[in-house]
Amino acid sequence: MDYFTAIGGVAMFTLIIMSFVAIILAARSRLVSSGDVTIHINDNPDNDVVTPAGGKLLQTLASEGIFLSSACGGGGTCAQCRCRVIEGGGSILPTEEGYFTQGEIRNHMRLACQVAVKQDMKIEIDPEFFDVQKWECEVISNDNVATFIKELVLKIPEGEEVNFRAGGYVQLEAPPHEVHYKDFDIAEEYQDDWNNFGIFKYVSKVDEPVIRAYSMANYPDEKGLIKFNIRIASPPPRGPDGIPPGKMSSWTFSLKPGDKVTVSGPYGEFFAKKTEAEMIFVGGGAGMAPMRSHIFDQLKRLNSDRKISFWYGARSIREMFYVEDYDQLEADFANFQWHVALSDPQPEDNWTGYTGFIHNVLLEEYLKGHPNPEDCEYYMCGPPMMNAAVIDMLHSLGVEDENIMLDDFGG
């Protein structure tokens, strides 16, 4: 091989490499957006957002102070960040299709967390999202109210206010963290159960920020605070090894007075109808939260004269909470009654009230003798199996879906 042949080979090789680089750069320029784009929102120029291209629509809007609901934090699993992308969003992705009907797809409905911001866009969102705010709150208290449920109470920053409707929710943001269950402050009366189920052994290690939605237990006239009922999502005691504990619930159970928590909201759709129909509330477990918010709001703020009853299912007396609050409401308001059914009362409970599952008790003790159960409004929140059982029972009585309101936190 002579000198000129070698030089020619090197030159040819270099040319090939440079051609590949040029092709890659050209492709990148087409696939990876750069520069600023304009997002036109709700056909109102005052809402226009000019922002760098390249992110997802959910996070892009959040960076501009527009917080769409997203209980999964943008993972594409909660389907709460629904919006209408009229122009500039490309074709709907397979990860989105299962959350929409064909009619909704034709109407350009999308999940904001799945839509890439590559070019100018025209979108429509619920106007209420413009009122969503974000606060850094402080933990006031975080005490057990039942074996596996804590009441977390947060203080709103001075001068701020959460303008929410009863039945609404907010999103909590947890930073990356590692929490050890053995460090939790668990009330002494509940520690035996935690030890018997081996719960103190768990560790929750989370490497990325987590966002989850929680219904508020307070009602609008309880100012300056936000109150939650949060159940620990520990692995099932007889489940296979390796199931991780719940990311957000583990973190919230570790919180102590003075700790800071980032909250955004308010959001919601689990609102009371403005009618005169009888209201029947059905709850279980941590589903107590929106029940309390609604019932207190109807009676103490609105002074409603609607007939209202609350049916709550618990395992035993140790799992009952807010008992004094509801007893007082029943004493103060002639139009309100509340009932508890225990599914597994303990001998020491000396329980003489209703027993069994709450949907059966509601049916046998009240709805079977009700002249028009189909005319009542039903508001429910509880474990998925409870919700399904109540809905099936109501359907069997001829209650239409429009009269069944569900806060499906476990669905």
From Swiss-Prot:
It catalyses: a ubiquinone + n Na(+)(in) + NADH + H(+) = a ubiquinol + n Na(+)(out) + NAD(+). It is found in: Cell inner membrane. It comes from the Bacteria. [2Fe-2S] cluster binds at residues 72, 78, 81, 113. Its main location: membrane. Pfam families: FAD_binding_6, Fer2, NAD_binding_1. InterPro entries: 2Fe-2S_ferredoxin-like_sf, 2Fe-2S_ferredoxin-type, Beta-grasp_dom_sf, Cbr1-like_FAD-bd_dom, FAD-bd_FR_type, FNR_nucleotide-bd, NqrF, OxRdtase_FAD/NAD-bd. The keyword Nucleus does not apply. This is Na(+)-translocating NADH-quinone reductase subunit F. It comes from Psychrobacter arcticus (strain DSM 17307 / VKM B-2377 / 273-4).
